[in-house]
């Protein structure tokens, strides 16, 4: 079963959309500054996750680091060989109520 390809939105697309939104509100901010803010935002997000902080954006969601247990029965898909996976940490996102409700209504 194959799924149809979904459109991909890049950081440049987001910068363009934010720039348009700002202009529609009669404000002026160059795209290079919008890009700097986005880059700084993601650096802060990564820095806080690496410090094991929980990052909460009300109604949007929560980012946190969770520990994933290791296992012995993992399989290398290229060789078929069984490998041991050690305990490790992963970034986790838990969507907020508003985001869940909005995504729930997506068609397709």
Swiss-Prot record:
GO biological process assignments: chromosome condensation
Protein name: DNA-binding protein HBbu
Gene designation per UniProt: hbb
Gene Ontology MF terms: DNA binding; structural constituent of chromatin
Disulfide pattern: none
Family: Belongs to the bacterial histone-like protein family.
Domain of life (superkingdom): Bacteria
Keywords on record: DNA condensation, DNA-binding
Effect seen on changing residue 23 to K: In strain: UO1
Ranges in a coiled coil: none
Gene3D superfamilies the UniProt entry points to: IHF-like DNA-binding proteins
One cellular component (GO) term of this entry: cytosol
The protein's role, per its UniProt record: Histone-like DNA-binding protein which is capable of wrapping DNA to stabilize it, and thus to prevent its denaturation under extreme environmental conditions.
């Amino acid at each position: 079963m194959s799924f149809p390809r979904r459109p991909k939105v890049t950081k440049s697309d987001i910068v363009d959309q934010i720039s348009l939104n700002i202009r529609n509100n009669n404000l002026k901010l160059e795209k290079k500054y919008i890009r700097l803010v986005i880059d700084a935002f993601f650096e802060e997000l990564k820095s806080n996750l690496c410090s094991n902080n929980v990052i909460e954006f009300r109604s949007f969601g929560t980012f946190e680091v969770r520990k994933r247990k290791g296992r012995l029965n993992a399989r290398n898909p290229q060789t078929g060989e069984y490998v041991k996976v050690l305990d490790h940490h992963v970034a986790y996102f838990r969507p907020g109520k508003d985001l869940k409700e909005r995504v729930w209504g997506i068609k397709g």
